[in-house]
Amino acid sequence: MERIKELRNLMSQSRTREILTKTTVDHMAIIKKYTSGRQEKNPSLRMKWMMAMKYPITADKRITEMVPERNEQGQTLWSKMSDAGSDRVMVSPLAVTWWNRNGPVTSTVHYPKVYKTYFDKVERLKHGTFGPVHFRNQVKIRRRVDINPGHADLSAKEAQDVIMEVVFPNEVGARILTSESQLTITKEKKEELQDCKISPLMVAYMLERELVRKTRFLPVAGGTSSVYIEVLHLTQGTCWEQMYTPGGEVRNDDVDQSLIIAARNIVRRAAVSADPLASLLEMCHSTLIGGTRMVDILRQNPTEEQAVDICKAAMGLRISSSFSFGGFTFKRTSGSSIKREEEVLTGNLQTLKIRVHEGYEEFTMVGKRATAILRKATRRLVQLIVSGRDEQSIAEAIIVAMVFSQEDCMIKAVRGDLNFVNRANQRLNPMHQLLRHFQKDAKVLFQNWGIEHIDNVMGMVGVLPDMTPSTEMSMRGIRVSKMGVDEYSSTERVVVSIDRFLRVRDQRGNVLLSPEEVSETQGTERLTITYSSSMMWEINGPESVLVNTYQWIIRNWETVKIQWSQNPTMLYNKMEFEPFQSLVPKAIRGQYSGFVRTLFQQMRDVLGTFDTTQIIKLLPFAAAPPKQSRMQFSSLTVNVRGSGMRILVRGNSPVFNYNKTTKRLTILGKDAGTLIEDPDESTSGVESAVLRGFLILGKEDRRYGPALSINELSNLAKGEKANVLIGQGDVVLVMKRKRDSSILTDSQTATKRIRMAIN
């Protein structure tokens, strides 16, 4: 108070006012504060002060030739004084107005191309719809989000090379454009920006926006795809939200969404195959997403999702060090534990062997619709603070945390036996058994957990076993909070290992991910996903399996035919026949297989019985492990279109129909391709026609390598010997004649010699 009086007193003297307003500031500390460094210390003041001057702008000397000294109103546009410390002229803001109205107009053709991201944004906003504003508490959590829609997914280094090549093609420096996307973009941009007058630096900045994903760690309550993030400031405040539907999709969001769907489908499918890891890699390498190889997208795309991370781990890429359980991402924020095997008894007296985490640890749990902070000790939940969109989401988080805590009362709450299996019909591990059990029904778990009195803490309420909020009581250690828990912000990636059952571990051996963690949610991909692998044939149902299996045989008929005669077991074990087995009734698979294999053996043994269509038709049935029986079949059943349909062993059926005249094969009425039979299979004079120009030397001789198909014979040099597969599926040794003159006699001798060679 005294000081204020003193100051008032001082100010009343006119001299004080004069000193404060007129004299220069000469205190070194103040001068230092405002003049050190390039950073402007008070930008808004500086701007106001500058604009109050007559000539606040400096411009290149050429301006004096292009802009008149005075405008129509007679106001001076530039000063004859040159700027101190540079050879530029001092210019009035009025000169800018004059230039905008009367200055030269250049071609605008390049603007939409260079500023593409801005033009696209305007279009999206124009077609977007803004709904009503709602006032309510916003539970925002910080998530790592993509902030520039419409970008390619190049790494910073790749983008830098592209930009240098497009904008500064003549600059020195090694630039290696290797990836498909780099080359395409460079070619496209060079064409678009020919004769572009916009400053190269600006073009470079804009290109960077188009090529590289930029992420920020922002508080978000709603959608996280980039077209929502660009309007974040319009759609959510501290206590309000505005509904918004974007006016267009962008490719980067589509890629992220389709990648997740493809990865989930692939992991689910691989998990049920004989060798999950090998199958997963085979599928990732043969899948295209929107025309781009899935493995290329995986290398560049930072999306973190359980299935995507399993695929990345399989490819040897680094992934985030957080782990997944029950659909929540767990990140340990403090503490440590050691793991020990322990046997526990459920409420049903079933013994479970669980890996117990001994020690005090704290975790953040982040899910799609709920987040939490979990503090736990050895087999004891100390505290869980959870927040979520609704009661259901909060309950999900509580169940996961209770199971994760490994508390005894949770294990004792199990009623009935635990025998959940995964898609491959293998028992789940004990922790996932418990999780599935309580996800189905958590009533007993919540009832047995225990209740406690609670203190009144700002922003926190208790929650009772029936999920109703309360300010007096709560389930032991559990509170519901208004504030969300931020996602783990670090973008650090760690080296991981993956076993053949797709369990991903960090270098300490902790399991980070497993197929059980992959969401079962089905979605429709926004970009076309092309799975070339036979394992994914079943994704479109039984009919697709049937058609694809036969198409595969027809496409590879030349090599299939050779294997059929030489190495049938290897052929029967081909993975392309695996999906087909699911169509054959389980009880009879083995008998069918035994029957077809016997039939094929007779074809190999008996001259003149080789039948292309019949082999193609029956081959998929021979792939199942055969049962020896004397059973004969005139038709084989496949389960398609919701019922059993028959394939006739001899003759056509709606399922498998071969038209001899058109040589077309139709499966279930769908065209499956052209089938070229061996020339005139009905007569046994086949070979003579085919083997003109070759001398038949006798039976197959393994020293001359695997049997060639008839088409491959033409590559032999004169005098060269080879084994060849002839019409009936028999193999003989031939030599290409040294002289052409004797070709005619071949036809007559061939038939005799073949009979001798085979018998």
Swiss-Prot record:
Main location, first listed in the record: virion
Superkingdom of origin organism: Viruses
Pfam families: Flu_PB2_1st, Flu_PB2_2nd, Flu_PB2_3rd, Flu_PB2_4th, Flu_PB2_5th, Flu_PB2_6th, Flu_PB2_7th
GO biological process, one term: cap snatching
Gene Ontology molecular function: RNA binding; RNA-directed RNA polymerase activity
InterPro entries: Flu_PB2_2nd, Flu_PB2_6th, Flu_PB2_C, Flu_PB2_CAP-bd, Flu_PB2_middle, Flu_PB2_N, INV_PB2, PB2_helical
Residue window of motif Nuclear localization signal: 736-739
Site feature (Mammalian adaptation) residues: 627
UniProt keyword list: Cap snatching, Eukaryotic host gene expression shutoff by virus, Eukaryotic host transcription shutoff by virus, Host gene expression shutoff by virus, Host mitochondrion, Host nucleus, Host-virus interaction, Inhibition of host innate immune response by virus, Inhibition of host MAVS by virus, Inhibition of host RLR pathway by virus, Inhibition of host RNA polymerase II by virus, mRNA capping, mRNA processing, Viral immunoevasion, Viral transcription, Virion
Cellular compartments annotated: Virion; Host nucleus; Host mitochondrion
GO cellular component, one term: virion component
Disulfide-linked positions: none
HAMAP family the record matches: INV_PB2
Subunit structure: Influenza RNA polymerase is composed of three subunits: PB1, PB2 and PA. Interacts (via N-terminus) with PB1 (via C-terminus). Interacts with nucleoprotein NP (via N-terminus). Interacts (via N-terminus) with host MAVS (via N-terminus); this interaction inhibits host innate immune response.
UniProt function note: Plays an essential role in transcription initiation and cap-stealing mechanism, in which cellular capped pre-mRNAs are used to generate primers for viral transcription. Recognizes and binds the 7-methylguanosine-containing cap of the target pre-RNA which is subsequently cleaved after 10-13 nucleotides by the viral protein PA. Plays a role in the initiation of the viral genome replication and modulates the activity of the ribonucleoprotein (RNP) complex.
Family membership noted in the UniProt record: Belongs to the influenza viruses PB2 family.
Descriptive protein name: Polymerase basic protein 2
Primary gene name: PB2
